Design a protein with these regions (language model features):
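N-terminal secretory signal peptides that target proteins for export/translocation
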Residues: 1-6
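Bacterial N-terminal signal peptides
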Residues: 8-19
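Hydrophobic small-molecule pocket/channel-lining residues, especially in calycin-type beta-barrels
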Residues: 24-184
């Protein structure tokens, strides 16, 4: 019975689908989104570098990091893929960070979106803010009573990122720093 009810709807939509396919014209990305994403043109590419991470009293842990930033969907979305590794006490290289992020501009809301997913199953939806030479994004960790922010600055050759935490939004404590060089 359901199929019979859906049949008229599907049959009426079929000519629209066929017409858009036959016309041979590619869809045009919204101009406002394309313009907003131009801010990140220098960030697109493949990057390699190193950094450190501090986990409270556990000291600093050094790591290597590879990042790839690609334009997708006609340039309206950036796909950021990152993988960090470090060496164990026995010299074995292990993955310490792996993430996939979508960065895009919502022209209707007038803001950027940062949608990140990591190896451990974590997800973050944040609103990046433009700063001189890059952008900032962050989130609140209620159970620890802190705000976490990351500041990413980049040019044609270098990507520098700092991670910080704050309990009051005024005093910031650095827990991460990394510098990457463009590979291509």
């Amino acid at each position: 019975m359901r199929c019979e009810m859906l049949r008229p709807l599907l049959l009426s939509a079929l000519p629209l689908l066929a017409a858009s396919t036959v016309s041979g014209q590619a869809p045009t990305p919204p101009a406002a989104q394309l313009e907003a994403m131009k801010r990140f043109d220098l960030w697109v590419g493949e990057w390699k570098g190193s950094g450190w991470l501090s986990r409270g009293g556990d000291g600093r842990h050094e790591f290597r990091i590879d990042e790839k930033v690609q334009r997708k969907l006609g340039g309206t979305v950036l796909l950021v893929e990152g993988r960090g590794t470090s060496r164990t006490d026995k010299g074995q290289e292990v993955a310490t960070h792996e993430s996939v992020t979508l960065l895009y501009y919502d022209d209707k809301a007038g803001r950027y979106h940062w949608n990140a997913h990591d190896l451990r199953g974590g997800t973050i939806d944040a609103e990046p803010k433009l700063v001189d030479g890059g952008f900032e994004w962050g989130f609140r960790v209620e159970e620890r009573g802190v705000t976490v922010r990351f500041t990413i600055r980049f040019d044609e050759k270098r990507w520098h990122e700092v991670g910080e935490t704050s309990a009051d939004g005024k005093t910031w404590n650095k827990f991460l720093e990394m510098t990457l060089e463009r590979q291509r």
